[in-house]
From Swiss-Prot:
One of its GO terms (biological process) is endomembrane system organization. It is a multi-pass membrane protein. Pfam families: DUF679 (PF05078). Involved in membrane remodeling. This is Protein DMP8. InterPro entries: DMP (IPR007770). The chain crosses the membrane at residues 70-90, 98-118, 174-194, 212-232. It comes from the Eukaryota. GO terms for cellular component: endoplasmic reticulum; endoplasmic reticulum membrane; plant-type vacuole membrane. It is found in: Endoplasmic reticulum membrane; Vacuole membrane. Residues 1-37 are annotated as: Disordered. Keywords: Endoplasmic reticulum, Membrane, Transmembrane, Transmembrane helix, Vacuole. Restricted to flowers.
Length: 243
């Protein structure tokens, strides 16, 4: 049986694969209710605030030490150590009330006075090998504790005539005043580079104080170095290493 073209037809189908969107991608994510989220305890939030404040204080201390490390050599040894030990007990958690601010003022005054007066002290080594300290005066060295005279206790005693009272090296000079004033300036530069001090003494002025203290310690170091070269000293008083 013959088939004509009208009775026989060929249809060609082209199959195209269409990617059906996944039901999960077409759907928008459901909002999560706030009530289902875990709530942090109040102590955790407060602890995070304290930890952040401690990190800021530690960062300020590191910045202070890095800026003023070159100035430490101009200060008596015990002054800066006392300041760094007493300040954390006053500052505590950053509570700058009236009492804490007053105590910071007193601490700064005490340390500044020690920087000033310690530069008017000197020492000498006696024949018994001990080191004796005293204040330099226009007349000579005024020893804090005079050694006992021979015959009272015996042993390691020196005669009072060994005290260099009339020695020119132990008389008050202009260099002593220059070094005292410069030492106070160096201490103030170090103290005000600490954010714990500026935050309590100048509340709300932290940004301005940071800008000032960016260059103030460097300027103090340059000026003090130049003046200490012009006015050298050979004092080995309280807080200095004796040779």
């Amino acid at each position: 049986m013959e088939k004509t073209e009208e009775s026989v037809g060929i249809r060609v189908y082209t199959t195209t694969t269409t990617q059906n969107p996944s039901p999960t991608s077409s759907r928008s994510p459901k909002p999560v209710p706030l009530s289902s989220l875990p709530m942090l305890p109040a102590g955790a939030a407060a602890g995070g605030g304290k930890g952040r404040k401690r990190r800021m204080v530690a960062k300020g201390v590191q910045k202070t030490v890095s800026k003023t490390s070159m100035l430490v050599n101009f200060l008596p040894t015990g002054t800066l150590l006392m300041f760094e030990m007493v300040l954390p007990t006053i500052y505590r958690d950053g509570d700058c009330n009236g009492i804490n601010t007053l105590m910071i003022h007193l601490l700064l005054l005490l340390c500044a006075m020690s920087c000033f007066f310690f530069h008017f002290t000197d020492s000498f080594k006696a024949s018994d090998g001990k080191i004796y300290y005293g204040f330099v005066t226009p007349r000579g060295l005024a020893v804090f504790m005079k050694p006992p005279s021979p015959g009272f206790g015996g042993g390691d005693v020196i005669a009072e005539k060994e005290i260099p009272v009339t020695d020119e090296r132990y008389k008050l000079r202009v260099n002593d005043f220059v070094h005292s004033v410069m030492s106070v300036l160096v201490f103030m530069a170090i103290a005000f580079s600490d954010r714990r001090v500026t935050g309590c003494l100048f509340p709300g002025k932290e940004k301005e104080m940071d800008q000032v203290m960016e260059s103030f310690p460097l300027m103090v170091g340059i000026v003090c170095s130049a003046l200490f070269l012009v006015f050298p000293t050979s004092r080995y008083g309280v807080g200095c290493m004796s040779t």
